[in-house]
């Protein structure tokens, strides 16, 4: 798998560079700061963070490549056949929290995992996806986001987008709140149903689609005026983001349990959050419409070309 791992690593480093350049250009003020780090147990990465910009209040685009002699519990719990295997995990993960409540938070991740044991076939798979978390949502933005997702999946089969869209809706769900984190997108894991080259081509299609999905929405919304009440609602909804990442997110749990770099793992958390006891939006308000209409499992592309 050595050549395969090298090819994936080269792609992921380039993807990180391209996404950072596009986001810096869109912000126009802030620049990413890079923190290269090493993991004592094996591997390391490039954490890049940005904040206090004209657009981005806090964000990060991380690359990591970690390896070790045995898997953490979060990885082997649902794959007991991997126990006793050495592993390599590579990925790019990003979260962008804009200051303007009219610009959604976005998250994307593409990753590769390989577990090897002498004398046995390697076990490998890809995972990833991207999802959108609006605060003041617009239907045209939701349609655009999902159209880009569908088009990225299309060359790999007509069933791919619906399957991974549904998986995303199911995965990014706060069970204790019985509500989705956002309006979804794509999510997939354990991808090895095709040969390596096809799976790798698919992961590249998804990684490359993120900027095409996100920047047009940013450009439409970043100059929309907002007030303090809307910022407070954004902070309240960001609380849901924190709850999901710390309680349910498999990537967060894997990173913490595998001795990953805590600062990089928790980079996804927003800078300002608030919780209010049993707070509910005014009936009929924009805030109420978010949960009543947008945060529902729906086919955003029904009737769309």
From Swiss-Prot:
Its EC number is 1.3.3.3. Keywords: Cytoplasm, Heme biosynthesis, Metal-binding, Oxidoreductase, Porphyrin biosynthesis. It is found in: Cytoplasm. Its cofactor is a divalent metal cation. It holds the Pfam family Coprogen_oxidas. GO terms for biological process: protoporphyrinogen IX biosynthetic process. Pathway: Porphyrin-containing compound metabolism; protoporphyrin-IX biosynthesis; protoporphyrinogen-IX from coproporphyrinogen-III (O2 route): step 1/1. The keyword Amino-acid biosynthesis does not apply. Its main location: cytoplasm. One of its GO terms (cellular component) is cytoplasm. A divalent metal cation binds at residues 97, 107, 146, 176. This is Oxygen-dependent coproporphyrinogen-III oxidase. The lineage of its organism: Bacteria, Pseudomonadati, Pseudomonadota, Gammaproteobacteria, Pseudomonadales.
